[in-house]
From Swiss-Prot:
Annotated Gene Ontology cellular component terms: plasma membrane; proton-transporting ATP synthase complex
Organism: Bordetella avium (strain 197N)
Taxonomic lineage from the root: Bacteria, Pseudomonadati, Pseudomonadota, Betaproteobacteria, Burkholderiales
Role, per record: Produces ATP from ADP in the presence of a proton gradient across the membrane. The gamma chain is believed to be important in regulating ATPase activity and the flow of protons through the CF(0) complex.
Domain of life: Bacteria
Gene, per the UniProt record: atpG
Membrane topology, as annotated: Peripheral membrane protein
Name of the featured protein: ATP synthase gamma chain
Length: 301
């Protein structure tokens, strides 16, 4: 049985650890609320762009944008969104496992993969497995910087337009609620005809073709022309989806970290209680032994 001093040292150590995890839990809770606000704030913009783009495409059915064209899949681009830091439960493990399974499917079909990494954890994974990396962004902080995101993703969009890839996927963690985060592997390009929002529907692929019904019966007047307007709207729509993927992952990260730190704090409290019980028993045994020795010594005298 360990001595009293050793047990007291262990209790002090666990108490210090609990203070750290409790502080991290509170910080994560604060960041989680802000991340959720940013995530939800981006949805109205994406919804309106999607709605307008769908209306314009219905009004101009003769124009088939490259983002809508179906091709034979020979190569794909994958944007892997992970965190820069750990201590967030199984968040990165789950999305990494899903991504590796999809990579195996691509390999079985002899489909090449060109990847973009957002976050240190994803970058490390792609580097270890030898995936061709075309762009990367790490140390994104607590608030996604749109300029940095678009700089990294432009490589993939250019590859798609120039035919180097035939589809573009994003692997991220969809925020469901504070206690649940769902790893998803979503197809961004080619776009489905209905331009559905994957982060609201929770679908693994953008296969749904639900059409947006227009309430407007008049013709549009375009400046400079219909093609330019649709091109710009679809570009912004895809960029909005990618921003949303990163925002969803950040909200999921803070939620998972808060839950993980709360579990760590609770476990530390339990360990402290168990150590305190052992300490009390050890101290009681030592006192009893000392009393017995004193009584025995007095009797001998």
């Amino acid at each position: 049985m360990p001595g009293i001093k050793e047990i007291r040292t262990k209790i002090k150590s666990v108490q210090n650890t609990r203070k750290i995890t409790k502080a991290m839990e509170m910080v994560a809770a604060s960041k989680m609320r802000k991340a959720q606000e940013r995530m939800r704030a981006g949805r109205p913009y994406a919804n309106k762009v999607r709605e307008i783009a769908a209306h314009l495409m219905q009004a101009n059915p003769e124009y088939n944008h490259p983002y809508l064209q179906q091709r034979e899949i020979k190569a794909v681009g994958v944007v892997l969104v992970t965190t820069d830091k750990g201590l967030c439960g199984g968040l990165n493990t789950n999305i990494s496992r899903l991504t590796l399974n999809r990579f195996k499917d691509f390999e079985a079909q002899n489909i090449q993969v060109r990847a973009t990494a957002f976050g240190n954890k994803g970058l490390g994974l792609l580097t270890r497995i030898g995936t061709k990396l075309v762009s990367q962004e790490t140390q994104l902080g607590d608030k996604p910087d749109l300029d940095r995101l678009l700089g990294a993703i432009k490589v993939q969009l250019d590859d798609y337009l120039e035919g180097r890839i035939d589809a573009l996927y994003v692997a991220t963690t969809r925020f469901v609620n504070t206690m649940k985060q769902e790893p998803v592997f979503l197809r961004l390009l080619p776009l489905a005809s209905g331009l559905n929002d994957p982060f609201q529907s929770g679908l693994e692929h953008l296969e749904s073709t639900t059409e947006v019904k227009s309430d407007y019966g008049w013709d549009y007047i375009y400046e400079p022309d219909a093609k330019s307007v649709i091109d710009d709207l679809l570009q912004r729509y895809v960029e909005g989806l990618l921003y949303q993927a990163v925002a969803e992952n950040m909200a999921s990260e803070q939620s998972a970290r808060m839950v993980a730190m709360k579990a760590a704090s609770d476990n530390a409290k339990k360990v402290i209680g168990e150590l305190q019980l052992v300490y009390n028993k050890t101290r009681q045994a030592a006192i009893t032994k000392e009393i017995s020795e004193i009584v025995g010594g007095a009797a001998a005298v």
